[in-house]
Amino acid sequence: MDILFYHPTFDTTWWINALREALPEAKVREWKCGDHDPADYALVWHPPVEMLAGRTLKAVFALGAGVDSILSKLQAHPEMLAPSVPLFRLEDTGMGEQMQEYAVSQVLHWFRRFDDYQALKNESRWEPLPEYRKEDFSIGIMGAGVLGSKVAESLKVWGFPLRCWSRSRKSWPGVESFAGKEELGAFLRKTRVLINLLPNTPETVGIINLHLLNQLQDNAYLLNLARGVHVVEDDLLIALNNGKLKGAMLDVFSREPLPAESPLWKHPRVAMTPHVAAVTRPAEAVAYISKTINRLEKGEPVTGQVDRIRGY
């Protein structure tokens, strides 16, 4: 069994050694330009077209939860990967726990009005504020995949009203489910905190625009943990400046790194992190990949395969 590995920033030596230990029967090598030797599996992140084109592979693993970079290249270069080759994403590998930590900490930050108290501190004002009530702090999660379910599970224990919106209806205990475009408005109207965990597909690009934001409750909050292209940033600024949105926490942006001239940097009600909400944990990723490859080799059922048409 031959395995190709490519990642532009990871510690390649660590990964190759870990994969060799987890799959002792495999020959693992780093892909380099000009390598056209046969391989059975490819483990990649933002792979060059040349790496995959023309290969007869059993499967390709994206080294992250999203596969949009591969799918976008496939649109421009369909010869890069035959339709018959299964494409897998990392289902969790520790990212769910990280998303839970991020979402819970930010929701509680807003609920306890720490953003307001920081603003008062900046003005040297000692002013206790009325507390929010949980029943008035409904949380809506857009995207009901593995990460969405993890976030909902972690927030449920705090007693907030929870709702989710996705392509198909879910049956999560304690979470009100909305499905399809026809139910999006009803989902938004009672949402105070909007958490975006949607996949990156042609249908979801630009979905968080002024029309959508205006349907939220007044003084709403936005937490974007998915992709920057989901948010129309100019519309977000309008909603913040006219008071519809009280605050936004952004981990992802339409352009990364975020340009220095972006008004988001200096907006007083925007907080941000540099795309670190959930990162690949190498040891857990190797365990998932090796387990999946072993099951594929035995012809056993596996999870994590991407539907190329849906984009996730």
Curated annotation (Swiss-Prot):
The active site is at R227, H275. Pfam families: 2-Hacid_dh_C. Its EC number is 1.1.1.79, 1.1.1.81. Keywords: Cytoplasm, NAD, NADP, Oxidoreductase. GO terms for molecular function: glyoxylate reductase (NADPH) activity; hydroxypyruvate reductase (NADH) activity; hydroxypyruvate reductase (NADPH) activity; NAD binding. InterPro entries: D-isomer_DH_CS, D-isomer_DH_NAD-bd, GhrA_Enterobacterales, NAD(P)-bd_dom_sf. It comes from the Bacteria. GO terms for cellular component: cytosol. It catalyses: glycolate + NADP(+) = glyoxylate + NADPH + H(+); (R)-glycerate + NAD(+) = 3-hydroxypyruvate + NADH + H(+); (R)-glycerate + NADP(+) = 3-hydroxypyruvate + NADPH + H(+). The keyword NAD applies. It is found in: Cytoplasm. Catalyzes the NADPH-dependent reduction of glyoxylate and hydroxypyruvate into glycolate and glycerate, respectively. NCBIfam families: PRK15469.1. Belongs to the D-isomer specific 2-hydroxyacid dehydrogenase family. GhrA subfamily. HAMAP family: 2_Hacid_dh_C_GhrA (MF_01666). This is Glyoxylate/hydroxypyruvate reductase A. It comes from Escherichia fergusonii (strain ATCC 35469 / DSM 13698 / CCUG 18766 / IAM 14443 / JCM 21226 / LMG 7866 / NBRC 102419 / NCTC 12128 / CDC 0568-73).
